[in-house]
Swiss-Prot record:
It comes from Sulfurihydrogenibium sp. (strain YO3AOP1). One of its GO terms (cellular component) is plasma membrane. The gene is fluC. This is Fluoride-specific ion channel FluC. Keywords: Cell inner membrane, Cell membrane, Ion channel, Ion transport, Membrane, Metal-binding, Sodium, Transmembrane, Transmembrane helix, Transport. Na(+) is not transported, but it plays an essential structural role and its presence is essential for fluoride channel function. It catalyses: fluoride(in) = fluoride(out).
């Protein structure tokens, strides 16, 4: 039961932060691209990689922390379904360049962010 509670708490925090990121990124950056999804995926990729390296290689923590961060928080904070839906919406508007840019930015920057998280965690 403890595992489920840890996942639920992490998931609740991730979901709320995801919502707030979407709201405030639209206000700050506009809506030309789905910036909120881009931000949560790039930041979430970094967080997941960084903390998994810390948990697996550097720190001796209760495995519940991995569930909290990886399954709970990052599981609700990041999303592939939003990228898919938002990109298809852009395609349906006929803006193929913007759709490709959205895909490239989400996957390219998320990959680089995850790599940076691993490198930074290993430097600690």
């Amino acid at each position: 039961m403890e595992k489920y509670l840890v996942i639920a708490v992490g998931g609740s925090i991730g979901a709320i932060l995801r919502y707030l990121t979407g709201v405030y990124s639209a206000k700050f950056f506009g809506t030309w691209l789905p910036y909120g999804t881009l931000i949560v995926n790039v930041v979430g990729s970094f967080i997941l990689s960084f903390f998994m390296i810390l948990f697996l290689e550097k720190l001796s923590l209760d495995p519940l922390w991995r569930l909290f961060v990886a399954v709970g928080f990052c599981g609700s904070y990041t999303t592939l379904s939003s990228i898919t839906y938002e990109t298809l919406s852009i395609v349906m508007d006929g803006d193929y360049v913007r759709a490709l840019l959205n895909i490239a930015l989400n996957f390219g920057l998320s990959f680089l962010s995850a790599f940076a998280g691993i490198v930074l965690a290993r430097m600690l």
